[in-house]
Amino acid sequence: MWIDCRTIARSIEERTKERVEKLGFTPKLVSVACTDDPSALSYLKSQRKKAEKLGIAFEILNVSPEEIVSTLKKLGSDESVNGVFVARPFPPSFDEKEILSSVPVEKDVEGVNPANLGLLLYDEEIFPPCTAEAAVRILERETNLSGKRVTVVGRSVTVGKPLALMLLKKGRDATVTVCHSRTVNLEEITKNSDIVVVAVGRAHFLKKNMVKEGAIVIDVGINYVDGKLQGDVDPSVEEIARVTPVPGGVGQVTTALLFEHVVRAAERQRK
């Protein structure tokens, strides 16, 4: 069975729009871009459309490699800007850690600055990474996480690692296993899990025989195969488990949360 993520995203957007109206001013998101990646540019276009729908001001700043860090620091002191997003992927020569560390902490609506990531160790979710939070929101709608055996396949800084911390948080209380490319007997681990989250960047990686019947599967994958968007989960898994679709799944909720974070940042800055 496919999980209806669009309804979750719409609910988040409706609440965000209500909060925008109560602010008394128009919050603003600035997306900084130094990439020619087609999928990144497409996402920026979708951000513009979503911002207009929600009543949020939006601007794209196209900068050179030499300007990106200084631009991010300037945005930190610009009182007209409430949220800052950095388009990725970066060119191979870029120092990703330096760039992400330059995103203003109080405007880091995507949750990429190491300072915001570090707060997750203390169960503080001010601006958690949007994709990881999207997975959590979907799971909380589908089930009670307490005591559930969750396997996260993938250990990236933006999804796997922060998601594991968020699932362990007191009040959620999941039992979490993190797997990766060196994990032995992966199928045995996933097959004994109530929930499997896959974020490995390999189309149709998780097969039907790797999942137990009735499990919940969160597909975070974004892969283009013959020009078509495919997830990390094989479509056959849907026959025995509840699965988030690709497209129209986690990505929908991720974008909705990005703009929820913009409003949260605006509310915090107003105080």
Curated annotation (Swiss-Prot):
Keywords, ordered alphabetically: Amino-acid biosynthesis, Histidine biosynthesis, Hydrolase, Methionine biosynthesis, Multifunctional enzyme, NADP, One-carbon metabolism, Oxidoreductase, Purine biosynthesis
Family, per entry: Belongs to the tetrahydrofolate dehydrogenase/cyclohydrolase family.
Self-association and partners: Homodimer.
Record-level Gene Ontology MF annotations: methenyltetrahydrofolate cyclohydrolase activity; methylenetetrahydrofolate dehydrogenase (NADP+) activity
Short name of one Pfam family: THF_DHG_CYH
Positions contributing to NADP(+) binding: 154-156, 181, 222
Organism listed in the record: Thermotoga sp. (strain RQ2)
Pathway: One-carbon metabolism; tetrahydrofolate interconversion
Known function: Catalyzes the oxidation of 5,10-methylenetetrahydrofolate to 5,10-methenyltetrahydrofolate and then the hydrolysis of 5,10-methenyltetrahydrofolate to 10-formyltetrahydrofolate.
E.C. designation(s): 1.5.1.5, 3.5.4.9
Domain of life assignment: Bacteria
Chain segments annotated as transmembrane: none
GO cellular component annotations of the record: cytosol
InterPro entries hit by this protein: Aminoacid_DH-like_N_sf, NAD(P)-bd_dom_sf, THF_DH/CycHdrlase, THF_DH/CycHdrlase_cat_dom, THF_DH/CycHdrlase_NAD-bd_dom
Protein name: Bifunctional protein FolD
Catalytic reaction equation(s): (6R)-5,10-methylene-5,6,7,8-tetrahydrofolate + NADP(+) = (6R)-5,10-methenyltetrahydrofolate + NADPH; (6R)-5,10-methenyltetrahydrofolate + H2O = (6R)-10-formyltetrahydrofolate + H(+)
GO biological process, one term: purine nucleotide biosynthetic process
